[in-house]
């Protein structure tokens, strides 16, 4: 959403890397020149008429992947933070797992900050409800195999959030693995996750994992 400042450089770095798959831009009702940049550069994109938010945009991409019979889909931000050299590792990881998370903290300690405190709370909530340890639950760089693509495409309110991952572990027997990655700084624009929004997000995720996800129905394989 509104990533005109970094979209072209992100896609060009993707195309210049060893990545040899397809890509699709999800324009989530952006008010900037995102759509024009896609048309000018002939980038394949879905142009959503209104801003659906992260969950809606993500599910639109998953519906596309499911309808076109992809067996792997990778969530990749347009702000320049995600690095394309890690895509092959994520793709390989979902050959034997359902979800692969690009993790900054598999081998590194989390820095001390309010945002990382929230990440720790979510990590504990996932551990309590699923028995699994996910060191970087808020990472936005994730890969999904064909089974998860179908679940995400057909399910209601399935977004790329820690509470959904927790639910899929508990109710769909999803196998989740973390792949060590490095991430860059945002190259343009501003993140919506300022201090206030980050605190609200972390609290909402923690409550959802602890109290809401555990009562949702199990889904079949």
Spans of features found by a protein language model:
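Acidic helix N-cap motif at the loop->helix transition within catalytic regions
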Residues: 5-9, 32-40, 85
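Conserved short acidic donor-positioning loop in nucleotide-sugar-dependent glycosyltransferases
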Residues: 14, 28-29, 52, 61
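A conserved acidic beta->alpha catalytic loop
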Residues: 27-35, 80
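Conserved donor nucleotide-binding strand/loop of the catalytic core
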Residues: 35-68
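Conserved catalytic loops of nucleotide-sugar-dependent glycosyltransferases that act on lipid-linked
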Residues: 57-58, 81, 85, 111-220
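Short beta-strand-to-loop acidic/aromatic patch adjacent to the donor-nucleotide binding site
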Residues: 70-81
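Conserved donor NDP-sugar-binding/catalytic core segment of glycosyltransferases
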Residues: 88-111
């Amino acid at each position: 959403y509104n990533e005109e400042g970094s979209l072209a450089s992100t896609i060009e770095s993707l195309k210049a890397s060893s990545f040899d798959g397809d890509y699709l831009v999800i324009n989530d009702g952006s008010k900037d020149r995102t759509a024009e940049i896609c048309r000018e550069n002939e980038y394949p994109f879905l142009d959503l008429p209104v801003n659906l938010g992260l969950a809606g945009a993500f599910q639109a991409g998953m519906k596309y992947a499911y309808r076109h019979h992809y067996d792997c889909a990778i969530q990749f931000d347009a702000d320049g933070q995600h690095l394309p050299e890690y895509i092959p590792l994520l793709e390989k990881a979902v050959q034997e797992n359902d979800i692969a998370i690009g993790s900054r903290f598999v081998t590194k300690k989390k820095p001390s900050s309010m945002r990382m405190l929230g990440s720790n709370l979510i990590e504990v909530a996932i551990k309590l409800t699923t028995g699994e340890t996910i060191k970087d639950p808020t990472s936005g760089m994730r890969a999904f195999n064909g089974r998860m693509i179908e679940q995400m495409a057909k399910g209601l309110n399935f977004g790329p959030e820690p509470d959904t991952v927790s639910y899929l572990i508990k109710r769909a027997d999803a196998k989740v693995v973390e792949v060590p990655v490095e991430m860059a700084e945002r190259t343009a624009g501003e993140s919506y996750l300022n201090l206030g929004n980050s605190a609200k997000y972390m609290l909402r995720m923690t409550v959802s994992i602890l109290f809401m996800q555990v009562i949702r129905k199990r889904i079949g394989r």
